[in-house]
């Protein structure tokens, strides 16, 4: 008989490349003279040593920093990041004191990311879980192709926010640009300010008491919008008229939504 596991061995619930860290162990990295690759290697090395709180000084807008972290971690960037920062993560809590470029936290699975200032386009592209928060404004195509999780924007959001989103929720406390929710399959977008225009198959829906309760709780946890009136929010959902699947594609339909 073929044996696929040994019941006497300890179970391992970690990814390969994920580490057990102690949040009370703290260290700092000065990134001023480091390439993005060397900095990521240092972060990984410190996690292997069990450090659970890592502060990165002088990130200087470098690209692809803090990517691929698959375990719990307190990660603080004192400054701004470039493109594709904090991508493909599953678990860490990240705080960035500056701003971020395009595609921050793309393909995020779990955790919490907080941006103190503004974010570029494609913020939270294809995220699947966790909370992604920007206290400032975000660029175009925020939440494009998102499949879960929550994106919270303290300022305004650019054009085509929520484009082709399939699940999850987006909260925008400010205004939204043109074509909000264009071609969305599912999910919900909440807008506190003005909507320049709705995209294809995006429609307004009735805000329920359950929605308002959830918004209050989420904003409180996110430490943003403490005086925001959730009762004035506009709720946007998919009209589902683009669900044009024929009888030969039941599996494709199930996989898409």
What does each of the following model-derived ranges do?
Residues 1-65, 135, 159, 164-257:
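Intrinsically disordered, low-complexity terminal regions
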Residues 57-59, 78-80, 87-90, 97-99, ...:
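Feature marks extracellular polysaccharide-active and adherence modules
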């Amino acid at each position: 008989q073929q044996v696929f596991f040994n019941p006497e061995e300890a179970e391992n619930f970690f990814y390969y490349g994920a580490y057990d860290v102690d949040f009370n162990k703290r260290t700092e990295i000065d990134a001023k003279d480091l390439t993005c690759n060397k900095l990521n290697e240092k972060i990984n090395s410190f996690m292997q040593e069990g450090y659970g709180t890592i502060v990165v000084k002088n990130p200087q807008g470098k690209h692809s920093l803090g990517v691929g972290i698959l375990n719990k971690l307190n990660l603080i960037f004192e400054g701004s990041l470039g493109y594709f920062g904090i991508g493909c993560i599953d678990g860490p809590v990240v705080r960035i004191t500056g701003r971020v470029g395009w595609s921050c936290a793309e393909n995020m699975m779990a955790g919490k990311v907080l941006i103190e200032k503004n974010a570029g386009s494609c913020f939270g592209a294809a995220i699947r879980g966790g909370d992604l928060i920007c206290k400032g404004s975000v660029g175009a195509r925020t939440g494009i192709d998102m499949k879960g999780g929550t994106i919270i924007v303290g300022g305004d959001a650019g054009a085509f926010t929520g484009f082709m989103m399939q699940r999850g929720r987006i909260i925008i406390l400010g205004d939204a640009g043109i074509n909000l929710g264009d071609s969305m399959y599912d999910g919900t977008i909440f807008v506190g300010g003005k909507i320049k225009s709705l995209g294809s198959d995006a429609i307004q829906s009735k805000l329920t008491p359950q929605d308002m309760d959830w918004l209050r709780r989420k904003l409180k946890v996110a430490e943003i919008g403490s005086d925001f009136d959730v009762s004035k929010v506009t709720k946007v959902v998919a009209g589902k008229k683009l669900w044009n699947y024929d009888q030969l594609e039941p599996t494709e339909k199930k996989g898409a939504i």
